[in-house]
Amino acid sequence: MRKRMASLAVAGSAALFAMTATQAPGADHAAPPGEGSAIFAAACAGCHGSDLSGGRGPSLFDPRLFTRLTDPQIHEAIEKGVKDSEMPPFGGTLDSAQIGAVIAYLHSRSAELAGGATATTGAPASAAVVRPPPNPDGQRIHSQTQDFQIETLVDHLDTPYGLAFLPDGRLLVSERTPTGNLRLIDPSGRQPPPRITGLPAIHQGQDAGLLDVAVGPNYARDGWIYLAYSDSDPSLPEPPPPAPGTPGFQIKRKPSMTVIVRGKIDAANRWTAQQEIFRAPWSVYTPSGAHYGSRILFDGKGHLFFSIGERGDMKNAQNLATPLGKIHRVNLDGSIPADNPFVRTAGALPSIWSYGHRNPEGLAIDPRTGLIWESEHGPVGGDEINLIERGANYGWGVVSKGMQPGIDAVSAPGMVDPAAWYFPTIAPSGIGFYEGNRYAGWKGSLFVCALRGQQLRRLTIKGRHVVDQEIVFSDLGRVRAIATGPDGLLYVLMTDPTGPGWNVDFTNPVRGRLVRLNPITWQQVEFKFQ
Protein backbone atom coordinates (compact mmCIF):
# COMPACT_ATOMS: atom_id res chain seq x y z
CA MET A 1 0.00 0.00 0.00
CA ARG A 2 2.77 2.44 0.90
CA LYS A 3 4.61 1.57 -2.32
CA ARG A 4 1.44 2.31 -4.26
CA MET A 5 1.11 5.69 -2.55
CA ALA A 6 4.61 6.66 -3.57
CA SER A 7 4.00 5.57 -7.14
CA LEU A 8 0.90 7.71 -7.54
CA ALA A 9 2.38 10.77 -5.84
CA VAL A 10 -0.91 12.62 -6.05
CA ALA A 11 -2.42 14.46 -3.11
CA GLY A 12 -5.97 13.17 -3.47
CA SER A 13 -5.02 9.54 -3.87
CA ALA A 14 -2.32 9.78 -1.24
CA ALA A 15 -4.86 11.06 1.26
CA LEU A 16 -7.11 8.08 0.66
CA PHE A 17 -4.31 5.54 0.82
CA ALA A 18 -2.89 7.14 3.94
CA MET A 19 -6.25 6.84 5.67
CA THR A 20 -6.85 3.27 4.56
CA ALA A 21 -3.31 2.17 5.41
CA THR A 22 -3.63 3.12 9.07
CA GLN A 23 -5.87 0.21 9.95
CA ALA A 24 -6.73 -3.13 8.40
CA PRO A 25 -10.06 -3.34 6.52
CA GLY A 26 -12.85 -4.36 8.83
CA ALA A 27 -11.14 -3.07 11.96
CA ASP A 28 -13.54 -1.75 14.59
CA HIS A 29 -12.80 1.90 15.17
CA ALA A 30 -14.60 5.20 15.09
CA ALA A 31 -13.92 7.30 12.00
CA PRO A 32 -12.41 10.66 12.91
CA PRO A 33 -14.45 13.80 12.17
CA GLY A 34 -14.16 14.94 8.57
CA GLU A 35 -12.86 11.60 7.34
CA GLY A 36 -16.00 10.95 5.29
CA SER A 37 -15.49 14.18 3.37
CA ALA A 38 -11.82 13.40 2.70
CA ILE A 39 -12.55 9.84 1.55
CA PHE A 40 -15.35 11.05 -0.70
CA ALA A 41 -13.11 13.69 -2.28
CA ALA A 42 -10.34 11.16 -2.96
CA ALA A 43 -12.33 8.10 -4.02
CA CYS A 44 -15.84 9.14 -5.04
CA ALA A 45 -15.97 12.69 -6.39
CA GLY A 46 -14.07 11.78 -9.55
CA CYS A 47 -17.08 9.79 -10.76
CA HIS A 48 -20.02 11.17 -8.78
CA GLY A 49 -19.11 14.85 -8.63
CA SER A 50 -19.19 17.11 -5.62
CA ASP A 51 -22.62 18.72 -6.05
CA LEU A 52 -26.14 17.97 -7.27
CA SER A 53 -24.98 17.85 -10.91
CA GLY A 54 -23.24 14.52 -10.45
CA GLY A 55 -20.47 13.38 -12.77
CA ARG A 56 -19.93 10.22 -14.76
CA GLY A 57 -21.99 8.59 -12.03
CA PRO A 58 -25.14 10.11 -10.50
CA SER A 59 -24.95 12.65 -7.72
CA LEU A 60 -24.86 10.96 -4.32
CA PHE A 61 -26.23 14.11 -2.69
CA ASP A 62 -29.67 13.86 -4.32
CA PRO A 63 -32.15 13.71 -1.39
CA ARG A 64 -34.21 11.17 -3.33
CA LEU A 65 -31.37 8.69 -2.87
CA PHE A 66 -32.15 8.45 0.82
CA THR A 67 -35.88 7.93 0.26
CA ARG A 68 -35.19 4.93 -1.97
CA LEU A 69 -32.27 3.34 -0.13
CA THR A 70 -31.54 2.63 3.50
CA ASP A 71 -28.11 3.30 4.97
CA PRO A 72 -27.38 -0.46 5.13
CA GLN A 73 -28.16 -0.74 1.40
CA ILE A 74 -25.81 2.14 0.60
CA HIS A 75 -23.18 0.56 2.86
CA GLU A 76 -23.49 -2.74 0.98
CA ALA A 77 -23.17 -1.02 -2.40
CA ILE A 78 -19.96 0.71 -1.31
CA GLU A 79 -18.53 -2.40 0.31
CA LYS A 80 -19.42 -4.97 -2.36
CA GLY A 81 -19.68 -2.85 -5.50
CA VAL A 82 -22.50 -2.96 -8.01
CA LYS A 83 -22.73 -5.73 -10.59
CA ASP A 84 -22.87 -4.66 -14.25
CA SER A 85 -21.71 -1.14 -13.45
CA GLU A 86 -18.50 0.83 -13.01
CA MET A 87 -18.90 0.81 -9.22
CA PRO A 88 -16.10 -1.36 -7.78
CA PRO A 89 -16.11 -2.95 -4.31
CA PHE A 90 -14.38 -0.81 -1.69
CA GLY A 91 -14.57 -3.44 1.05
CA GLY A 92 -10.91 -4.31 0.65
CA THR A 93 -9.89 -0.66 0.91
CA LEU A 94 -12.27 0.92 3.41
CA ASP A 95 -13.35 -0.57 6.71
CA SER A 96 -16.93 -0.46 7.99
CA ALA A 97 -16.43 2.70 10.04
CA GLN A 98 -14.90 4.54 7.09
CA ILE A 99 -17.82 3.55 4.86
CA GLY A 100 -20.13 4.77 7.60
CA ALA A 101 -18.27 8.08 7.66
CA VAL A 102 -18.82 8.46 3.91
CA ILE A 103 -22.55 7.79 4.33
CA ALA A 104 -22.75 10.33 7.15
CA TYR A 105 -21.05 12.86 4.89
CA LEU A 106 -23.54 12.11 2.10
CA HIS A 107 -26.41 12.89 4.47
CA SER A 108 -24.91 16.14 5.75
CA ARG A 109 -23.84 17.41 2.33
CA SER A 110 -27.20 16.45 0.83
CA ALA A 111 -29.03 18.44 3.50
CA GLU A 112 -26.67 21.35 2.95
CA LEU A 113 -27.29 21.40 -0.81
CA ALA A 114 -31.02 20.91 -0.37
CA GLY A 115 -31.00 23.96 1.86
CA GLY A 116 -29.72 26.00 -1.06
CA ALA A 117 -26.23 26.86 0.17
CA THR A 118 -22.82 25.57 -0.75
CA ALA A 119 -20.21 24.69 1.83
CA THR A 120 -17.65 27.19 0.63
CA THR A 121 -19.58 30.27 -0.47
CA GLY A 122 -23.01 30.15 1.13
CA ALA A 123 -24.44 31.07 -2.28
CA PRO A 124 -27.51 29.28 -3.61
CA ALA A 125 -26.45 25.86 -4.87
CA SER A 126 -28.06 26.34 -8.27
CA ALA A 127 -26.26 29.61 -8.82
CA ALA A 128 -22.97 28.08 -7.71
CA VAL A 129 -22.98 25.10 -10.05
CA VAL A 130 -24.70 26.21 -13.26
CA ARG A 131 -22.57 27.90 -15.90
CA PRO A 132 -23.21 28.64 -19.57
CA PRO A 133 -21.32 26.30 -21.92
CA PRO A 134 -18.19 27.73 -23.54
CA ASN A 135 -18.25 28.86 -27.16
CA PRO A 136 -15.03 27.93 -28.99
CA ASP A 137 -15.96 29.68 -32.25
CA GLY A 138 -13.51 32.43 -33.14
CA GLN A 139 -11.09 31.64 -30.32
CA ARG A 140 -7.50 32.47 -31.24
CA ILE A 141 -5.04 30.01 -29.72
CA HIS A 142 -1.29 30.38 -29.28
CA SER A 143 0.42 26.99 -28.91
CA GLN A 144 4.11 26.17 -28.68
CA THR A 145 4.69 25.98 -32.43
CA GLN A 146 1.48 27.10 -34.13
CA ASP A 147 -1.12 29.85 -33.79
CA PHE A 148 -4.62 29.07 -35.04
CA GLN A 149 -8.23 30.14 -34.85
CA ILE A 150 -11.15 27.81 -34.11
CA GLU A 151 -13.99 27.98 -36.62
CA THR A 152 -17.32 26.28 -35.93
CA LEU A 153 -18.56 24.65 -39.14
CA VAL A 154 -21.63 22.80 -37.85
CA ASP A 155 -23.34 23.50 -34.55
CA HIS A 156 -26.13 21.67 -32.71
CA LEU A 157 -24.95 18.15 -33.43
CA ASP A 158 -26.39 15.63 -30.99
CA THR A 159 -23.63 13.97 -28.92
CA PRO A 160 -21.22 13.44 -31.85
CA TYR A 161 -18.74 10.58 -31.49
CA GLY A 162 -16.86 9.72 -34.72
CA LEU A 163 -15.92 11.44 -37.98
CA ALA A 164 -14.45 10.23 -41.25
CA PHE A 165 -13.76 11.97 -44.56
CA LEU A 166 -14.96 10.79 -47.95
CA PRO A 167 -12.60 11.27 -50.90
CA ASP A 168 -14.68 14.22 -52.20
CA GLY A 169 -14.13 16.23 -49.01
CA ARG A 170 -17.50 15.59 -47.38
CA LEU A 171 -17.40 13.87 -44.04
CA LEU A 172 -19.51 11.47 -42.05
CA VAL A 173 -20.27 12.22 -38.40
CA SER A 174 -21.87 9.70 -36.05
CA GLU A 175 -24.17 10.95 -33.30
CA ARG A 176 -24.53 8.85 -30.17
CA THR A 177 -28.22 9.70 -29.82
CA PRO A 178 -31.26 7.63 -28.76
CA THR A 179 -31.90 6.97 -32.46
CA GLY A 180 -28.27 6.87 -33.60
CA ASN A 181 -27.80 9.40 -36.39
CA LEU A 182 -25.20 9.32 -39.15
CA ARG A 183 -24.77 12.73 -40.78
CA LEU A 184 -23.23 13.56 -44.16
CA ILE A 185 -21.63 16.98 -43.82
CA ASP A 186 -20.34 19.45 -46.39
CA PRO A 187 -17.58 21.37 -44.57
CA SER A 188 -18.33 24.44 -46.68
CA GLY A 189 -21.67 24.71 -44.89
CA ARG A 190 -23.56 25.11 -48.16
CA GLN A 191 -26.29 22.70 -47.07
CA PRO A 192 -27.79 21.34 -43.83
CA PRO A 193 -26.21 17.98 -42.98
CA PRO A 194 -28.62 15.24 -44.11
CA ARG A 195 -29.27 12.19 -41.95
CA ILE A 196 -28.52 8.76 -43.41
CA THR A 197 -31.63 6.58 -43.18
CA GLY A 198 -31.97 2.82 -42.84
CA LEU A 199 -29.32 2.26 -40.17
CA PRO A 200 -29.56 -0.86 -38.00
CA ALA A 201 -31.48 -0.70 -34.72
CA ILE A 202 -29.17 0.90 -32.16
CA HIS A 203 -29.23 0.43 -28.40
CA GLN A 204 -28.77 3.68 -26.48
CA GLY A 205 -28.04 4.50 -22.86
CA GLN A 206 -25.08 5.84 -20.87
CA ASP A 207 -22.04 5.04 -23.09
CA ALA A 208 -24.11 3.22 -25.72
CA GLY A 209 -25.32 4.40 -29.12
CA LEU A 210 -23.93 4.84 -32.60
CA LEU A 211 -20.20 5.01 -32.00
CA ASP A 212 -17.39 5.15 -34.55
CA VAL A 213 -17.60 5.55 -38.32
CA ALA A 214 -14.75 4.81 -40.74
CA VAL A 215 -14.43 4.99 -44.51
CA GLY A 216 -12.97 1.79 -45.93
CA PRO A 217 -9.47 1.96 -47.44
CA ASN A 218 -10.82 0.90 -50.85
CA TYR A 219 -13.89 3.15 -50.75
CA ALA A 220 -13.27 4.66 -54.19
CA ARG A 221 -13.52 1.15 -55.63
CA ASP A 222 -16.01 -0.69 -53.39
CA GLY A 223 -17.90 2.01 -51.42
CA TRP A 224 -17.67 0.29 -48.02
CA ILE A 225 -18.24 2.34 -44.86
CA TYR A 226 -17.73 0.76 -41.43
CA LEU A 227 -19.75 1.44 -38.26
CA ALA A 228 -19.40 0.50 -34.60
CA TYR A 229 -22.58 0.61 -32.55
CA SER A 230 -24.20 -0.91 -29.48
CA ASP A 231 -26.77 -3.61 -30.04
CA SER A 232 -29.33 -5.33 -27.80
CA ASP A 233 -31.37 -8.51 -28.16
CA PRO A 234 -34.58 -7.52 -29.99
CA SER A 235 -36.43 -10.48 -28.47
CA LEU A 236 -36.13 -8.96 -24.98
CA PRO A 237 -38.59 -6.27 -23.87
CA GLU A 238 -37.40 -2.81 -22.98
CA PRO A 239 -37.42 -2.28 -19.20
CA PRO A 240 -39.78 0.47 -18.01
CA PRO A 241 -38.17 3.89 -17.61
CA PRO A 242 -36.90 4.50 -14.08
CA ALA A 243 -38.65 6.92 -11.78
CA PRO A 244 -36.81 10.22 -11.18
CA GLY A 245 -34.15 9.82 -8.54
CA THR A 246 -33.80 6.05 -8.94
CA PRO A 247 -30.27 5.03 -7.86
CA GLY A 248 -28.13 3.97 -10.80
CA PHE A 249 -27.68 0.40 -9.62
CA GLN A 250 -31.46 -0.07 -9.43
CA ILE A 251 -32.02 0.94 -13.07
CA LYS A 252 -32.83 -2.06 -15.25
CA ARG A 253 -31.08 -2.22 -18.62
CA LYS A 254 -31.25 -4.60 -21.56
CA PRO A 255 -28.08 -6.61 -22.15
CA SER A 256 -26.08 -4.99 -24.95
CA MET A 257 -22.84 -5.36 -26.87
CA THR A 258 -20.65 -3.66 -29.47
CA VAL A 259 -21.24 -4.73 -33.08
CA ILE A 260 -19.13 -3.86 -36.15
CA VAL A 261 -20.80 -3.71 -39.58
CA ARG A 262 -20.09 -2.32 -43.01
CA GLY A 263 -22.49 -0.97 -45.60
CA LYS A 264 -22.92 1.53 -48.40
CA ILE A 265 -24.71 4.85 -48.80
CA ASP A 266 -26.75 5.24 -51.97
CA ALA A 267 -27.65 8.40 -53.90
CA ALA A 268 -30.74 8.89 -51.71
CA ASN A 269 -28.61 8.84 -48.54
CA ARG A 270 -29.84 5.41 -47.49
CA TRP A 271 -27.75 2.78 -45.71
CA THR A 272 -27.71 -0.35 -47.86
CA ALA A 273 -25.93 -3.67 -48.48
CA GLN A 274 -25.04 -4.14 -44.80
CA GLN A 275 -22.67 -6.95 -43.80
CA GLU A 276 -21.69 -7.94 -40.27
CA ILE A 277 -17.98 -7.83 -39.52
CA PHE A 278 -18.13 -8.73 -35.83
CA ARG A 279 -20.95 -9.87 -33.57
CA ALA A 280 -20.53 -11.63 -30.23
CA PRO A 281 -22.87 -14.39 -29.04
CA TRP A 282 -25.84 -13.35 -26.88
CA SER A 283 -24.13 -14.85 -23.83
CA VAL A 284 -21.53 -12.05 -23.94
CA TYR A 285 -24.15 -9.28 -23.86
CA THR A 286 -24.26 -7.53 -20.49
CA PRO A 287 -26.69 -5.08 -18.81
CA SER A 288 -23.80 -2.74 -18.01
CA GLY A 289 -24.09 0.61 -19.74
CA ALA A 290 -20.38 1.32 -19.56
CA HIS A 291 -17.20 0.93 -21.59
CA TYR A 292 -18.12 -0.03 -25.14
CA GLY A 293 -14.77 1.32 -26.35
CA SER A 294 -15.33 1.27 -30.08
CA ARG A 295 -12.81 2.83 -32.42
CA ILE A 296 -12.06 1.49 -35.88
CA LEU A 297 -8.65 1.57 -37.60
CA PHE A 298 -7.26 0.25 -40.90
CA ASP A 299 -3.58 -0.67 -41.14
CA GLY A 300 -3.21 -0.34 -44.92
CA LYS A 301 -2.40 -4.06 -45.18
CA GLY A 302 -5.92 -5.41 -45.51
CA HIS A 303 -6.72 -5.51 -41.79
CA LEU A 304 -9.28 -3.79 -39.59
CA PHE A 305 -8.61 -3.14 -35.90
CA PHE A 306 -11.39 -2.30 -33.46
CA SER A 307 -11.58 -1.79 -29.71
CA ILE A 308 -14.10 -3.02 -27.14
CA GLY A 309 -14.11 -2.04 -23.47
CA GLU A 310 -14.46 -4.48 -20.57
CA ARG A 311 -18.00 -3.20 -19.88
CA GLY A 312 -17.27 -2.24 -16.28
CA ASP A 313 -15.99 -5.66 -15.14
CA MET A 314 -12.20 -5.69 -14.99
CA LYS A 315 -12.04 -9.51 -14.87
CA ASN A 316 -13.08 -9.55 -18.54
CA ALA A 317 -9.91 -7.78 -19.63
CA GLN A 318 -7.67 -10.75 -18.72
CA ASN A 319 -10.03 -13.43 -20.04
CA LEU A 320 -9.10 -14.50 -23.58
CA ALA A 321 -12.44 -16.29 -23.96
CA THR A 322 -14.39 -13.01 -24.09
CA PRO A 323 -14.08 -10.13 -26.57
CA LEU A 324 -14.44 -7.58 -23.76
CA GLY A 325 -11.43 -5.46 -22.84
CA LYS A 326 -9.57 -6.23 -26.07
CA ILE A 327 -8.21 -4.79 -29.30
CA HIS A 328 -9.31 -7.03 -32.18
CA ARG A 329 -7.84 -7.56 -35.65
CA VAL A 330 -9.80 -9.00 -38.56
CA ASN A 331 -9.65 -8.89 -42.33
CA LEU A 332 -11.76 -6.25 -44.08
CA ASP A 333 -14.59 -8.75 -44.54
CA GLY A 334 -14.49 -9.87 -40.89
CA SER A 335 -12.61 -13.11 -41.44
CA ILE A 336 -9.72 -13.97 -39.13
CA PRO A 337 -6.11 -13.44 -40.27
CA ALA A 338 -4.06 -16.61 -39.97
CA ASP A 339 -1.24 -14.77 -38.18
CA ASN A 340 -3.33 -13.38 -35.31
CA PRO A 341 -1.59 -14.15 -32.00
CA PHE A 342 -4.25 -16.40 -30.42
CA VAL A 343 -5.50 -18.32 -33.44
CA ARG A 344 -4.02 -21.53 -32.05
CA THR A 345 -4.63 -20.83 -28.35
CA ALA A 346 -7.26 -23.17 -26.95
CA GLY A 347 -10.30 -21.30 -25.66
CA ALA A 348 -9.13 -17.90 -26.89
CA LEU A 349 -11.03 -15.76 -29.39
CA PRO A 350 -9.02 -15.73 -32.61
CA SER A 351 -9.85 -12.08 -33.35
CA ILE A 352 -7.92 -10.81 -30.29
CA TRP A 353 -4.80 -8.78 -31.04
CA SER A 354 -4.09 -7.44 -27.54
CA TYR A 355 -5.79 -7.64 -24.15
CA GLY A 356 -5.86 -6.19 -20.64
CA HIS A 357 -7.69 -3.02 -21.71
CA ARG A 358 -10.26 -1.05 -19.70
CA ASN A 359 -12.05 1.33 -22.08
CA PRO A 360 -10.02 2.03 -25.24
CA GLU A 361 -11.61 4.92 -27.16
CA GLY A 362 -8.77 5.92 -29.48
CA LEU A 363 -6.78 4.10 -32.16
CA ALA A 364 -4.27 5.59 -34.61
CA ILE A 365 -1.42 4.37 -36.78
CA ASP A 366 1.84 6.29 -37.05
CA PRO A 367 2.36 6.66 -40.82
CA ARG A 368 6.11 6.98 -40.34
CA THR A 369 6.59 3.68 -38.52
CA GLY A 370 3.37 1.70 -38.97
CA LEU A 371 3.09 1.37 -35.18
CA ILE A 372 -0.40 1.41 -33.65
CA TRP A 373 -1.21 3.70 -30.74
CA GLU A 374 -4.20 3.65 -28.42
CA SER A 375 -5.86 5.86 -25.79
CA GLU A 376 -7.60 4.30 -22.80
CA HIS A 377 -9.67 5.52 -19.87
CA GLY A 378 -8.31 4.65 -16.44
CA PRO A 379 -10.40 4.28 -13.27
CA VAL A 380 -9.78 7.29 -10.98
CA GLY A 381 -6.75 8.63 -12.82
CA GLY A 382 -4.44 6.27 -14.65
CA ASP A 383 -5.58 7.18 -18.18
CA GLU A 384 -3.17 5.68 -20.70
CA ILE A 385 -1.55 6.17 -24.08
CA ASN A 386 -0.33 2.76 -25.24
CA LEU A 387 1.76 1.37 -28.07
CA ILE A 388 -0.28 -1.64 -29.19
CA GLU A 389 1.66 -4.78 -30.07
CA ARG A 390 0.76 -8.28 -31.17
CA GLY A 391 -0.41 -10.50 -28.31
CA ALA A 392 0.55 -8.03 -25.57
CA ASN A 393 -1.15 -7.78 -22.18
CA TYR A 394 -1.74 -4.19 -21.00
CA GLY A 395 -2.56 -5.20 -17.46
CA TRP A 396 -6.04 -3.94 -16.62
CA GLY A 397 -7.57 -6.08 -13.92
CA VAL A 398 -4.14 -6.67 -12.38
CA VAL A 399 -2.22 -3.38 -12.59
CA SER A 400 -3.14 0.28 -12.97
CA LYS A 401 -1.53 3.68 -12.60
CA GLY A 402 -4.87 4.90 -11.24
CA MET A 403 -6.92 4.19 -8.13
CA GLN A 404 -8.98 1.00 -8.30
CA PRO A 405 -10.11 -1.09 -5.33
CA GLY A 406 -8.72 -4.59 -5.77
CA ILE A 407 -5.63 -3.42 -7.67
CA ASP A 408 -2.51 -2.55 -5.68
CA ALA A 409 0.21 -3.01 -8.32
CA VAL A 410 1.21 -0.31 -10.77
CA SER A 411 3.22 -2.69 -12.97
CA ALA A 412 3.97 -6.40 -13.23
CA PRO A 413 6.19 -8.75 -15.26
CA GLY A 414 4.65 -9.67 -18.59
CA MET A 415 2.37 -6.63 -18.63
CA VAL A 416 3.11 -3.61 -20.79
CA ASP A 417 3.44 -0.22 -19.12
CA PRO A 418 1.78 2.74 -20.87
CA ALA A 419 3.88 5.06 -22.98
CA ALA A 420 2.21 7.95 -21.14
CA TRP A 421 -0.33 8.12 -18.34
CA TYR A 422 -2.32 10.81 -16.56
CA PHE A 423 -3.29 11.55 -12.97
CA PRO A 424 -5.70 13.22 -12.40
CA THR A 425 -7.82 11.88 -15.19
CA ILE A 426 -8.24 13.59 -18.57
CA ALA A 427 -10.58 10.91 -20.06
CA PRO A 428 -8.83 10.48 -23.44
CA SER A 429 -11.02 9.65 -26.42
CA GLY A 430 -10.16 9.88 -30.13
CA ILE A 431 -6.56 10.24 -31.28
CA GLY A 432 -4.90 10.93 -34.62
CA PHE A 433 -1.51 11.59 -36.21
CA TYR A 434 -0.99 14.69 -38.31
CA GLU A 435 1.07 14.31 -41.50
CA GLY A 436 -0.02 17.40 -43.44
CA ASN A 437 1.86 20.62 -44.17
CA ARG A 438 -0.62 23.27 -43.03
CA TYR A 439 0.72 23.67 -39.48
CA ALA A 440 4.40 24.40 -38.94
CA GLY A 441 5.90 22.16 -36.29
CA TRP A 442 2.95 19.77 -36.00
CA LYS A 443 3.97 17.22 -38.62
CA GLY A 444 4.27 13.75 -37.09
CA SER A 445 2.49 14.77 -33.86
CA LEU A 446 -0.11 12.59 -32.17
CA PHE A 447 -3.20 14.55 -31.12
CA VAL A 448 -5.20 13.29 -28.14
CA CYS A 449 -8.79 14.39 -27.48
CA ALA A 450 -9.74 14.62 -23.80
CA LEU A 451 -13.27 14.69 -22.40
CA ARG A 452 -12.98 15.39 -18.69
CA GLY A 453 -9.96 17.56 -19.22
CA GLN A 454 -11.70 19.46 -22.04
CA GLN A 455 -8.35 19.40 -23.78
CA LEU A 456 -6.70 18.83 -27.09
CA ARG A 457 -3.18 17.55 -26.41
CA ARG A 458 -0.27 17.25 -28.84
CA LEU A 459 2.26 14.49 -28.17
CA THR A 460 5.69 14.31 -29.76
CA ILE A 461 6.46 10.70 -30.70
CA LYS A 462 9.94 9.42 -31.47
CA GLY A 463 9.83 5.81 -32.54
CA ARG A 464 8.25 3.94 -29.65
CA HIS A 465 8.30 6.74 -27.08
CA VAL A 466 6.37 9.84 -26.07
CA VAL A 467 9.10 12.44 -25.56
CA ASP A 468 7.08 15.62 -25.07
CA GLN A 469 3.53 16.95 -24.99
CA GLU A 470 1.57 20.16 -24.72
CA ILE A 471 -2.03 21.18 -24.10
CA VAL A 472 -3.03 22.86 -27.37
CA PHE A 473 -6.26 24.23 -25.89
CA SER A 474 -8.52 23.53 -22.93
CA ASP A 475 -11.79 24.52 -21.22
CA LEU A 476 -13.71 25.02 -24.46
CA GLY A 477 -15.81 21.86 -24.21
CA ARG A 478 -15.31 18.11 -24.23
CA VAL A 479 -13.06 17.05 -27.13
CA ARG A 480 -14.19 13.76 -28.65
CA ALA A 481 -12.51 13.05 -32.01
CA ILE A 482 -10.07 14.51 -34.54
CA ALA A 483 -9.30 13.91 -38.22
CA THR A 484 -7.23 15.47 -41.00
CA GLY A 485 -9.24 16.65 -43.99
CA PRO A 486 -8.22 16.39 -47.65
CA ASP A 487 -7.27 20.08 -47.37
CA GLY A 488 -4.64 19.22 -44.75
CA LEU A 489 -6.54 20.98 -41.96
CA LEU A 490 -7.57 19.44 -38.65
CA TYR A 491 -11.26 18.91 -37.90
CA VAL A 492 -12.42 18.28 -34.34
CA LEU A 493 -15.66 17.07 -32.75
CA MET A 494 -16.53 18.78 -29.47
CA THR A 495 -19.49 18.78 -27.09
CA ASP A 496 -20.69 21.02 -24.30
CA PRO A 497 -19.30 20.09 -20.87
CA THR A 498 -21.26 17.74 -18.64
CA GLY A 499 -21.20 16.83 -14.98
CA PRO A 500 -20.27 18.99 -11.98
CA GLY A 501 -20.79 22.70 -12.54
CA TRP A 502 -22.67 22.38 -15.84
CA ASN A 503 -26.10 21.13 -14.74
CA VAL A 504 -26.01 18.45 -17.46
CA ASP A 505 -25.87 14.77 -16.59
CA PHE A 506 -23.21 12.97 -18.61
CA THR A 507 -25.72 10.31 -19.71
CA ASN A 508 -28.01 12.86 -21.39
CA PRO A 509 -27.72 13.89 -25.05
CA VAL A 510 -25.60 17.01 -25.29
CA ARG A 511 -25.05 19.65 -27.94
CA GLY A 512 -21.97 19.16 -30.06
CA ARG A 513 -20.19 20.86 -32.92
CA LEU A 514 -17.70 20.28 -35.71
CA VAL A 515 -14.86 22.78 -35.68
CA ARG A 516 -11.84 23.40 -37.88
CA LEU A 517 -8.44 24.65 -36.75
CA ASN A 518 -7.42 27.39 -39.18
CA PRO A 519 -3.70 28.20 -39.01
CA ILE A 520 -2.66 31.80 -38.45
CA THR A 521 0.63 32.83 -40.01
CA TRP A 522 2.81 35.65 -38.73
CA GLN A 523 2.06 37.52 -41.97
CA GLN A 524 -1.66 37.45 -41.10
CA VAL A 525 -0.97 38.68 -37.58
CA GLU A 526 1.25 41.53 -38.82
CA PHE A 527 -1.37 42.59 -41.38
CA LYS A 528 -4.06 42.70 -38.71
CA PHE A 529 -2.11 45.25 -36.67
CA GLN A 530 -0.98 47.50 -39.53
Predicted regions and their residues:
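Repeat-solenoid scaffold signature
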Residues: 348-384
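Extracytoplasmic electron-transfer domains, predominantly the class I c-type cytochrome c fold
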Residues: 46, 51-56, 61-113, 209, ...
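Conserved blade-ending motifs and adjacent loop-strand segments that build the rim/top face
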Residues: 357, 466-486
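Surface-exposed loop and turn segments in beta-propeller and other repeat-based domains
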Residues: 194-208, 273-291, 332-353, 396-423
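Acidic, Gly/Ser/Thr-rich repeat motifs that build Ca2+-stabilized beta-propeller blades
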Residues: 95, 99, 109-314, 362-365, ...
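Electrostatic cytochrome c docking/interface patches
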Residues: 22-39, 292, 349
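Bacterial N-terminal signal peptides
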Residues: 9-20
